[in-house]
């Protein structure tokens, strides 16, 4: 009998439907506590409801005065538009370096609103991670070009020394080297946990562009950019979608989890997991409701969560 159930499930599971769910989810820029994440969560909810399930959305506060255990929550963030242009010697915009509308991760997530022209500086030493890198260098009101860990550079440059923002061209170390992915952008975000007020903006460029700017700065060129970010922070929510298939033994359950968040498109991390779980739950509900599959002994509970939070 178990073999028959297995065959039934194999026939009923649709890889094409799972792929369609991946396509739908990846249309949303779904970082934690954002309108894009909420839109993806609504899509999951609608699909579960259409399959006869009764999903519930649990909303946990995205606010700086809230803590989950020892971890502070954070404000929700929405970005309407953001661009970064290179300026010529006359102060006119020439090359478009970054555009949130085209590539959302070309903006450092959770940037504050800004509009203005800024000189770009690059630091020696550890690239802005340590206080010694700033000796004899005035970064106040300037944009710091760096590929080093964002949190440490932002603290040193923006918080302690009044830099306006960060221009980031780093790539995650590991088996890759810079030349393997010269045109890749690394997903990067400020985190303003707890009572710390957001105080900076930033953009992300690829290694190729970053190296060109570094070479020009090293040669004495005056590199200036025009930055525009339209964003807002507000008390929002971290949403968790839950669906449940009851079992015949009320005290026992199987818990299935997928994280729904991450920047657009992030198909493998983790739209694929969220879509697979969605397809499994709707398939099982259909088979059980039609009588083709008996109700399981243990309940099956699925949750779609924002990773590391909520």
Language model region names:
Residues 2-4, 23-137:
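Noncatalytic luminal/extracellular "stalk/propeptide" segments of secretory-pathway proteins
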Residues 102-131, 189-270, 279-282, 286-291, ...:
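Soluble metallo-hydrolase cores and metallopeptidase-like ectodomains found primarily
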Residues 1-20:
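Generic start-of-chain signal for non-secretory N-termini
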Residues 41, 67-71, 129-132, 148-159, ...:
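Short alpha-helical segments and helix-capping/turn motifs at coil-helix boundaries
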Residues 15-37, 47-55, 73-74, 143-148, ...:
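Catalytic-core environment of secreted peptidases
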Residues 23, 35, 98-201, 265, ...:
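Extracellular/luminal Protease-associated
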Residues 82-85, 146, 223-228:
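Short conserved beta-strand and strand-loop elements enriched in small hydrophobics
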Residues 6, 13, 97, 202-203, ...:
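Metal-dependent peptidase/peptidase-like ectodomains
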């Amino acid at each position: 009998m178990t073999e028959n159930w297995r065959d039934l499930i194999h026939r009923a599971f649709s890889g094409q439907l799972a792929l369609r769910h991946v396509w739908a989810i990846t249309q949303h820029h779904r970082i934690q506590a954002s309108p894009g994440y909420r839109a993806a969560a609504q899509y999951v909810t609608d699909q579960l409801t259409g399959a006869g399930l009764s999903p519930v959305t649990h909303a946990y506060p995205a606010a700086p005065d809230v803590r989950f255990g020892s971890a502070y929550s954070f404000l929700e963030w929405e970005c309407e538009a953001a661009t970064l242009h290179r300026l010529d010697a006359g102060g006119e915009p020439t090359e478009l370096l970054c555009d949130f509308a085209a590539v959302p991760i070309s903006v450092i997530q959770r940037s504050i609103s800004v509009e203005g022209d800024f000189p770009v500086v690059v630091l020696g030493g550890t690239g802005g991670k340590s206080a010694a890198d700033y000796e004899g260098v005035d970064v106040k009101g300037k944009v710091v070009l760096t590929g080093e860990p964002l949190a440490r550079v932002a603290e040193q440059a923006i918080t302690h020394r009044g830099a306006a923002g960060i221009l980031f061209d780093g790539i995650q170390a590991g088996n890759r080297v810079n030349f393997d992915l010269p045109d890749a952008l690394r997903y990067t975000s400020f985190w303003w946990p707890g009572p710390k007020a957001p105080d900076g903006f930033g953009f992300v460029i690829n290694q190729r562009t970053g190296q060109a700017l570094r070479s020009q700065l090293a040669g004495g060129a005056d590199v200036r950019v025009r930055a525009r970010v339209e964003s807002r922070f507000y008390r929002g929510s971290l949403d968790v979608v839950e669906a449940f298939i009851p079992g015949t033994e009320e005290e026992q359950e199987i818990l299935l989890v997928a994280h729904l968040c991450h920047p657009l498109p992030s198909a493998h991390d983790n739209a694929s997991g969220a879509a697979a779980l969605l397809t499994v739950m709707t398939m099982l509900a259909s088979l059980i409701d039609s009588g083709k599959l008996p109700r399981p002994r243990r309940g099956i509970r699925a949750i779609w969560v924002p990773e590391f939070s909520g």
